[in-house]
């Protein structure tokens, strides 16, 4: 059976047999392949449970033999932030701390806490999300600017060093909050402060889940 997916649905992670990327855009293909590599690194996918096919620019079918071959393919398509998003991030970073806080509070006032951003993300797969834990209550369940921001800070921290740059969080948001700017800004910060390129897989673990004595601390306020 041929299964065509926009993202690898978490419930299918362990049972998925065939993923076709036929007739998809280049960005779609690379985003999906990055998802596969990241999920495999996090032990959510096994090579013997997955067959990945795509079509090259000449219409020839490519069958990836394993995760290493996917990584080799992706080496020619490094994860980058679009010029438009870089300009938006730069505008945000040039704001004063107070201006930036006001901007995000205004955006968070629109949030209805539907968690579409979580549902759309190909790398949100926890069987029980932090927002569903009520003992202790990490994030308040009602919608209000401050608690909405608490939720997004948690989400972005969990995505740090893992985001594949697909922008699904922004696309899924029914009220148009530019959530992707948070994760993509984090990408920039991680590259600048830790020297880890966007989309890079660190065998030791994700950048914010590991510690090195030589890590810089001068940017922490």
Which residue stretches match the model-derived regions?
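Phosphate- and divalent-cation-binding pockets in alpha/beta enzyme and binding domains
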Residues: 35-38, 120, 172, 181
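Ferredoxin-type iron-sulfur electron-transfer modules in oxidoreductases and energy-metabolism complexes
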Residues: 88-108, 126-221
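Alpha-helix N-cap/helix-start capping motif
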Residues: 30-33, 115, 167
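Extended mid-to-C-terminal alpha-helical interaction segments
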Residues: 109-129
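Iron-sulfur-associated redox domains of electron-transfer enzymes in respiratory
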Residues: 1-109, 122
């Amino acid at each position: 059976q041929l299964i065509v997916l926009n993202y690898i649905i978490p419930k299918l992670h362990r049972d998925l047999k065939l993923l076709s990327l036929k007739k998809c855009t280049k960005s779609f293909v690379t985003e999906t392949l990055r998802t596969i590599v990241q999920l495999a690194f996090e032990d959510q996918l096994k090579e013997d449970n997955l067959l990945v096919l795509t079509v090259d620019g000449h219409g020839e079918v490519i069958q990836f033999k394993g995760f290493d071959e996917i990584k080799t393919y992706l080496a020619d398509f490094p994860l980058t932030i679009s010029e438009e998003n870089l300009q938006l991030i730069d505008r945000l970073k040039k704001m004063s701390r107070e201006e930036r806080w006001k901007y995000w509070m205004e955006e968070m006032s629109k949030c209805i806490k539907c968690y579409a951003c979580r549902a759309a993300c190909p790398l949100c797969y926890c069987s029980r999300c932090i927002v569903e834990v009520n003992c202790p209550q990490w994030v308040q369940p009602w919608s209000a600017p401050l608690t909405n921001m608490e939720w997004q800070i948690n989400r972005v921290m969990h995505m740090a060093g893992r985001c594949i740059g697909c922008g699904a969080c922004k696309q899924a948001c029914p009220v148009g909050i530019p959530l992707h700017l948070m994760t993509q800004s984090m990408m920039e910060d991680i590259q600048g402060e830790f020297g880890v390129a966007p989309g890079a897989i660190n065998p030791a673990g994700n950048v914010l889940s590991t510690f090195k004595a030589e890590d810089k601390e001068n940017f922490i306020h």
